[in-house]
Amino acid sequence: MTEENSSITAETVASHGLSPEEYDTIKQALGRTPNLVELGIFSAMWSEHCSYKSSRKHLRELPTTGSQVICGPGENAGVVDIGDGQAAIFKMESHNHPSYIEPYQGAATGVGGILRDVFTMGARPVANLNALRFGSPKHPKTPHLVSGVVAGIGGYGNCVGVPTVGGEVNFHPAYDGNNLVNAMTVGVAETNKIFYSAASGAGNPIVYVGSKTGRDGIHGATMASADFGKDAEEKRPTVQVGDPFSEKLLIEACLELMASDAIVAIQDMGAAGLTSSAVEMASKGEVGIELDMDMVPCREEGMTPYEMMLSESQERMLMVLKPGREAEAEAIFKKWELDFAIIGRVTDSKHMVLTWKGDIVCDIPLAPLADNAPCYDRPWVATPKAKALGAVPASGSITDNLVTLVGSPDLASRRWIWEQYDNMVGADTVQCPGGDAAVVRVHGTEKALAMSVDVTPRYCRADPEEGGKQAVAECYRNITAVGALPLASTDCLNFGNPERPEIMGQIVGAIKGIGEACRALDMPIVSGNVSLYNETRQDDGSSLAILPTPTIGGVGLLQDWRDSTTIAFKNTGEEIYLVGNSGQGHLGQSIWLREIAGREEGTAPSVDLAQEKATGDFIRAMIQDGMLCAVHDISDGGLAVALAEMALAGNIGATVEAHDKAIAEHAYYFGEDQGRYLVSSTNAVALVSAAEKAGIPVFRLGVTGGDAVVLNSQSVSLEKLRKSHEAFLPELMQ
């Protein structure tokens, strides 16, 4: 066997992100010293991004099965039964590191990559969502990152013809050196037309389709598995470049071929490119794979096998076809003006063999690359319990506080962002951004899918386990609030350096909380992603890690899209009720505490999962019975902010003259106690009666009407609230 470069030094190994111990393991697995091609392949497959070597042990604790689950983690995306022979297919992934280095392309290719994960399974993508985290609004780089990321998401999603229907955006100094871009795609497929990635059939042709391979994105997976230093800007060549028009052609070509029975297995080329797609297909099928690198379509001259295998050029797929179907498949891809090349064959060797110019340049047993990749039980320490907050004095009037909060970075309107996204393409969007969850009709039916992405990082910092539970619970509430039954979830776990025991403790705690909530709320994790090393080395040698950010994406089902509810008050005279516990006025880790009192401390609010489930079941039943006019979950900013958002959405004021006298007024209105909904109804007697029968607490708060929000006789006009609410992002982006 020839070696593309036999001079493997300690520096070469380190530059590939491998430890000396890992390099020794590679030599033992091969029984020899690897050449550069093989080293690069091991580097990519053993990167944190591909192998999950620090989190895999703990991810096994998550619930992944259920009566509704057709396919859980391990494939390109999760698959959930939605009835009538149809399935929802969805996943969320991160593109954090690339989006900090080159925000437009990083975010755009994040969207492209998650789209491919979904349509690879045979689904037509119907919706995109995103969860974004940026640094302090005062940081000089923040406007640049916001502008680039939003433009990248919109530019790619709009061109490819998939609506961007929801998401969330937060700002915090902990993200100054590492912004987060988590992208989620939801698709719909027929349950008898779902495609998987396990290769089979020795001798079957392996086909490369899509765009040509270039040098963009080489070592992208390795770069995404390390923290940043001062050289972050120099890593631009590791960021992929996307072409949404090619992606659109690829979607249509793949779905057209999928209508036949020509495909044995299919895998998109995502992180680690051709390396990961080839290894995953062969290892899942327990077969071997042989590739002729001379046949790989390249857009740049003189590309080597090392570059071809590690390139992360976008809009590419790998397929195993049934023998004799090559011409049929080629005709389809040529019609769509895409590359099509037979680059290899399935073997029974359980090795990955690469040839180039007549020589073997790689021969690796597949087991060490995939199933036997490193899995670490890293040392961890539990996050210390936060100190209880105690009483916090009021500061200013309730209404002045409300005006400040609705205009604050984490609660201000996101209109500037979502107006750059096409959220109606496809003509099936029922609820656009701005509510609790997006709602998209299942084309040609009365059914609809509801979807939301959620996490509260400040809670996770204070208590990772409780924060993990709350992320799932809030996603559950948001989906419930539009009338849908939550079915399943996907996660995107964003943390700092797992080699630091305190960070590993955050990971362990969050996963434990997520698992507990998913089991209690019957929202199994069916797909997901882990993004670690989200921290930046400071001038003094210390590291700034992001807040622990375990994002949860959920999907729910409405049997009839016309039954969905919104947050907007509909008419004057609707009675306003709080459904769920009255709350304890929990101000620890709240937006009020940060924005009004200037403090970030205290315990995270606790989540009662049994009560969460019972209250959610009640809310859905009331929506189904037509008892509720508007529904909104109470989360960031507490009851008063939820009330203001409902009033602004419907352009109808509200008067509330009730609060628990045992709780300070500001704590009552701005406390972030969990498991609660704000609703309006024109059938209050029946609502209260049903709640009593179900054992669900309800509290009458007031009535809709007028052009102001009135809290205990303190009034603020909708005009003043709206002016504050709409100002933040346009002013930031001037």
Curated annotation (Swiss-Prot):
It catalyses: N(2)-formyl-N(1)-(5-phospho-beta-D-ribosyl)glycinamide + L-glutamine + ATP + H2O = 2-formamido-N(1)-(5-O-phospho-beta-D-ribosyl)acetamidine + L-glutamate + ADP + phosphate + H(+). Its main location: cytoplasm. One of its GO terms (biological process) is 'de novo' IMP biosynthetic process. Gene3D superfamilies: PurM-like C-terminal domain, PurM-like, N-terminal domain. The keyword Ligase applies. It is an enzyme of class 6 (ligase). Its EC number is 6.3.5.3. The active site is at residues 49, 95. Part of the phosphoribosylformylglycinamidine synthase complex involved in the purines biosynthetic pathway. Catalyzes the ATP-dependent conversion of formylglycinamide ribonucleotide (FGAR) and glutamine to yield formylglycinamidine ribonucleotide (FGAM) and glutamate. The FGAM synthase complex is composed of three subunits. PurQ produces an ammonia molecule by converting glutamine to glutamate. PurL transfers the ammonia molecule to FGAR to form FGAM in an ATP-dependent manner. Monomer. Part of the FGAM synthase complex composed of 1 PurL, 1 PurQ and 2 PurS subunits. This is Phosphoribosylformylglycinamidine synthase subunit PurL. It comes from Zymomonas mobilis subsp. mobilis (strain ATCC 31821 / ZM4 / CP4). The gene is purL.
